Amino acid sequence: MKKLVAIILLLFSFPAGNAAAEETKEPEIISEAAIVTDSESGAVLYAKNADKKMYPASLTKIATAIYAIEHGDLSDLATVSKKAAETEGTRVYLEEGELVPLKKLVQGMLVNSGNDAAWSIAEHLDGNIEAFSQNLNRYLKEKAGLKNTHFVNPHGLYDENHYTTAADLAKLTNYALKNETFREIYGTKELKWTGKSWDTTIFTHHRMLKGEVPFEGVTGGKTGFVDEAKQTLATSAEYDSIKLTAIVLKAEYKRDIYNDTKNLLDYGHSNFETAELSSSEVFPSDGKTYTTGGANIPITLPKGNYEENITAKGKLQIKNENGRIIQSVKLIEDKQDEVVSSQFKTDKEPVKETTGYYGKAGLALFLFGIFILVLRKNLKAKARRRRRRV
């Protein structure tokens, strides 16, 4: 009896609303523009000036790398031109006439940020920088879905007409991370380099990836700097329940881009997880049913309270407890009558349906009713025993 009373009191002690943890405060960011996204679903978890026109510096090389990987033969030998060998800025010290495999050029460009390697890639793929830039911009628009990016060189040295946004860079990086070769090079910490004039070991410039700024989960990254762009940084990280991409642009000091990145990653993996819309699921709404169109679609869920609804146009929207749309997925109307209850799947466990206050209150009332029935039965039994004694 005491146990039953304790259960009822416990149920009535729940506060109104979902008992899940509240979303923590958004990160404080010093850099002029920043964004953190779910690398798999693309959902924007936090953004600051994400659509503002910015200069990327060497983050440009992410675009050059994935373009080269997808459009070139990585085993091809590229001939280093005089102009490539004389490219200013960070280099891997290529010499005019040197023959270098395309993959090695991509490695030298991403790991050691070699501008000479980037120039050689562009000339090898498209003959000259002008043709390369035209083809690269078309590729970025058509393949990666970038809308506010225009590049005029392969390395990111300043040009007024060479610009992008934090949102586009995150979208680009997420696209590139789907490629295994890109992920391998992007996550390389050190690499033995044997060249015509330079035998050494090259190291990533990304301090979190290298371990100089310790931080759990970092799997890849790229640094950037020119006077006009200031410090820029791209970072990928992986945790049990989510993979993240963080971009920070235009910070005065290196410590700021790393602190901002840590804050973005902390916020992302503490508050969100990646789930999956199964190809077999059917979503009912206003007398219609919708499906994913036969595909398994990654989707991002807040770890605290969230709401899901389907709009009149068939978009599944996930909103956090403040009503902000975390992700919107276009569904396909299903003409069949079968309706299957939808439930998101996560890597850890299925997402639990929320009961809410009234659900808990109903359960409590049900148990309270049982308690009354048991109590009445016990009282009647005691009364019968007393009558027998008399």
Model-inferred region functions:
Residues 7-14:
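Bacterial N-terminal signal peptides
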Residues 14-15, 73, 272:
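Hydrophobic alpha-helical membrane context
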Residues 146, 158-163, 167-390:
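Domain-terminus/edge residues, biased toward the C-terminal soluble/receptor-binding domains
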Residues 1-4:
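Positively charged n-region of N-terminal signal peptides that target proteins for export
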Residues 19-184:
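Active-site-adjacent loops and short helices of periplasmic peptidoglycan-processing enzymes
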